[in-house]
């Protein structure tokens, strides 16, 4: 399912009842919890969150942890942005406005001081410099998938933040909380979609860092890549489009090849990054 998050529960239920594999791109926490509960009695694979974040970023973050004897911090960052921004929002809605608004409004899961908790979205601002370009990052919901469940009690810090051009988060807070548009999501969606239509030239930034101890020495591992539009079989794909689609298709290829479990709920962090990259579609990320 590539449908908006609020349509996925009945589709997942139908897949469960019919015993067929299910994959989606949802970032919605409650939808994922619903599907996770279905997984206990599923005779086929139920794999939500197969996009970028949640999805690929969790696979990458988990892969970095294998270098450590003990993990201290896991910090994951993803941004899908116009390559040539304009206006104060400096953004373009190249994916579901429903999803963007949902992840800006809902609280985000995180682990802080070893404890799993919920933190407000559009908070925790930090500034990032990527190859000389300044960005901001702030908390948004859903990006960690099931990682908080996996690492609760095992790490001091685990968080996910969305990368944006500076000033974007403050303006979104103004729209949602000062103008109270958080209570009228349909109007907010219309305003944003009309003001910031999709662009052809976009970029996806993927950044993950893990800190911990190797042989009693504190060290740090990082992954960073910027993905741009590419041509696939004669058709140009936006960066957000092909990276999202390829993340999902690579997981399908792994299930079809028997590399992954054939039934039950599938966590993204259970997918080996090396095997992911070895699939025909996953190889696009090399």
Model-derived regions: residue spans:
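C-terminal catalytic/substrate-binding lobe primarily of soluble NAD(P)-dependent oxidoreductases
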Residues: 66-286
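Adenosine-phosphate binding glycine-rich loop
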Residues: 42-82
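Short amphipathic alpha-helical segments and helix-helix/interface helices
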Residues: 12, 35-37, 61-65, 148, ...
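Rossmann-like NAD(P)-binding element
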Residues: 1-8
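Glycine-rich, histidine-containing beta strand-loop boundary motifs that form or position
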Residues: 3, 26-27, 50, 78
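Rossmann-fold NAD(P)-binding glycine/threonine-rich loop
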Residues: 10-13, 17, 21, 25-48
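Short gly/pro/ser/thr-enriched loop/turn and capping motifs at secondary-structure boundaries
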Residues: 8, 29-33, 52-56, 81-84
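Alpha-helix N-cap/helix-initiation motif
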Residues: 4, 50, 237-241
